[in-house]
Amino acid sequence: MQKRNPSVQLALNGTPIYLNNILMSVSVKREEKDMSGQKSSTKKSDKGVKAKELSVTGFIPYNRKEWLTQLFNLAEAETGKGEQTKYRVSCTVAEAVNMREVQFSGEVSATEQNGQLGWSISFRLREVNSVAEKKDQRKKKPKVKTQGENAPVAKSAGENSGKLEEQKDERKGIAKDIDDFFGGIDG
């Protein structure tokens, strides 16, 4: 008699994650910084929305150890560059919160259960390349104004006296550039 798999409620890159009694919860964190110092003020600065996390718990019976093997293989997988593999996530809760691409985060645990002949499973999937991150990357970066070179200004014969030359040599940086732009110092 063939063993029946439970319904697929979670898949990574199309690979089903089989767990009995699967429970999933999703969370998102808004990062804040306390700005009150040592005062009794409650001012905080918002640092934005951080990556969503999908927490998964379930049960794998001893007679389905291949499910556990597959889960750990996915958790340990790396790309050719030695980086942790990213997965396209498929489940109703992830779809509901617009969570698309994830990586395993923190601990993947399998704990033997007394009297139940199986392992209690728990792991977390953290969102990567989130919609918020993509939106920030698409925003236009502010243009930095650079100081352009000024065209040389013709000078009258009176400005070429020794006293005015000494004054010009003392001026440096922006003040000199501005003065040169407007035609020198009137004596």
Curated annotation (Swiss-Prot):
Name recorded for this polypeptide: Uncharacterized 20.8 kDa protein in lys 3'region
Lineage, opening ranks: Viruses, Duplodnaviria, Heunggongvirae, Uroviricota, Caudoviricetes
Region described as Disordered: 131-187
Bias kind Basic and acidic residues: ranges: 162-179
